[in-house]
Amino acid sequence: MKKIILLLLILAGFITKNYSQFKITGTISDSKTHQTLPNASIFIPELNIGVISDLNGNYTLENIPNGKYDVKFSYIGYFDLIKNLSEKNNILQLNISLNPKSPICLNQVVITAGTYSTQDETAIKIETINKKDIEGFGGISLIKDLSRIPGIDAVSKGNGIATPIIRGLSTSNILVLNNGVKMQNFQFSVNHPYLIDEFGVERIEVVKGPASLLFGSNAVGGALNMIKESPAPKSTIKTDVNMNYNSNTQGLVTNVGVKSTPGNYFFGLRAGIKSHKDYIDGNGKIVPNSRFNAKSFKIFTGFNAKNLVSKLFVDYNLMKLGLSVPPAFKLFSGNDRTNNYWYQDLSNILISTKNVLYLGKIRNELNINYQTNNRKLFETPDISEEFKTVDMLLNTWTYELKTSKPFGDHKMIFAFQGLNQNNKNSNAPEHVLPDFSIYDLAGMGLVQLNFMKKLHTQIGIRYDFRHINIKKQEHVHQDINKNFQNLSFSMGLTGILSHKVLIRSNIASGFRTPSIAELSQEGGHGARYELGNPNLAPQRNIEGDLSLHIHNTKTVLEFSGFYNYINKYIYLSPTDETSIHGLPVFKYLQDNAKLYGFETNFGFFPASWMNFSFAYNYLVAKKNNDSYLPLIPQNKLRGNISFSKSFDKKQLKDFSFEIESIYAFVKNNHHIAESNTPAYNIYNLSAVQTLAFNRQKIKISAKINNLFNTTYIDHISTLKGLGYYEIGRNINIGIKIILDKH
């Protein structure tokens, strides 16, 4: 591997001297008034390069390798415009007219489909959650906030612990990615949160349905991809300071980011802290030990040469996370920030490199990632190292070599991927998972065909091989050596029937190998005793999706239906047995399963400053015998009314106000070990005002979640049955200061 990397770098040095480039130049203006727009952004996501227009709206973007790219033009208060660029000349004159915003926006550049594409070019339905929406949630947990999106929910244990659910599937059945890198956090359990926060995230891309073609094992239900923020435009320094206070938990959040692009080199760094006391539910009761404290530090850097783009990212996250479990309730002595007992001490370091080399029209990408995740559990009030109960260290190397080549309006993509992973327990008394190692190898081919810009098809196939090695050790009575193989496919079609109507269909397969816990676990975990099964077979599924998008100047309608059939679905089932310590025994079993349903969205925009939207999702999840699967969320109806106004004042700028309603229907069709869950209805409010002072902007926000302090419990909350409910009224006050220096 080292020799290959060295050879590529030497080759890159030679090639960057011999391949030509071009530049684009032009003027950005308003499409109606024809006034020029200063400080507009011009950005090429694939190359990670960008500039801003000058006081007269003029711009020049240089050092662009010959090839095909999507260029994004954006300006506050206007629609983003995406231009497909394919040029071999030295200079391209490109004048752009931007349209003032209305609430309807169809197209964005996405990367989770395997390559940079606009949304209407992808045969896979990819939803995007932009930075404005992420900042506007106003919740305490990013993952829980995502449950406001139809088809996405979260299994939670308080505020700090939340695991996403996509169309009824969670934990080992979905993937969470940090800028395209699989997060590794012992995700077999809902008690193990992903160490990632909302700061430094440009947008979140959501794939609903099998994504094994792109990511391999575990992407049975879909994937969430947290896309990192873009570098600063050339010759600028951007700084943002974020401060938030949450009334319910007396939560304090501070995050500061700085980034700059002095030339062909760019860099950025970001640091933040979060501290929350135990939360108070709608009944006014303190939920013991739901507190958490977190720290984060992020760095990115890179450079653009003639035909080479190289980027390095380092993320370091720390979290001390209280566990709201019955043994902790007995030790509760008062609300506090400090983690004293029954808490997880978590750390995660992710180092990733992304390197792109252009050889004519051929794009070659080499990505290498290293991730280390340490999970410690302390149960007693003594926080010294001698009293830790669990101490596991998971080290993961992943690598990817990808090549894409356009031919006409079409594109071919080939990729080779691999993973080396090992887990090591220290001398802590409990080994939740044994020591193990995993090795993956995979090859993938994908063809994207575009006909007359009206019909887009995507066909792909992938082969995966996985080897799992678990040596005989405590709670593992024999060596477990397993080899798994799988062939995945995906076929999709997007038809643009008119500029107002888009239809998309897709059929895809997915798979996942049994997790280490499912193969080997034997011991207490939480409030139960879990028994693994070394003879479990891989899960395989196939899903069909059909979606429709219709819009005009005042309305938008979207519908997405799906049917997901899973062969040998793995689940944890209760038994009639009891362990020697009195814990109920649960065993991992397999059965065929089916999940089907739909999501629909309707928006009405009577004026440019007013927006009404409604969304409903429906889901059924059963085994073949028609009994229900566990941890399936309630069907929900969401309503939203928003008002926005842009002021052409010297200091007073954008203002927005939003009212949101979430209604969860009663849940009486559930797994045999679960109980009925009543319906609930909660309301949220938010208001944001932007002020401007020269090159400084200040955003002041006030958000109220659970406005009427409703007492409720969600069906998939792990606190259900313990006498505690979801968080009560929470008022979030935030200030964001943005400083630009040219």
Please describe what each predicted stretch is.
Residues 29, 40-45, 74-78, 88-135, ...:
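Short, acidic, small-residue-rich periplasmic hinge/interaction motif at the N-terminus
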Residues 36, 80-82:
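A structural signal for beta-strand boundary/capping segments at domain termini and interdomain linkers
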Residues 47-58:
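Short, acidic Ser/Thr/Gly-rich low-complexity loop/linker segments typical of extracellular
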Residues 102, 112-137, 144, 155-169, ...:
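Outer-membrane beta-barrel proteins, especially TonB-dependent receptors
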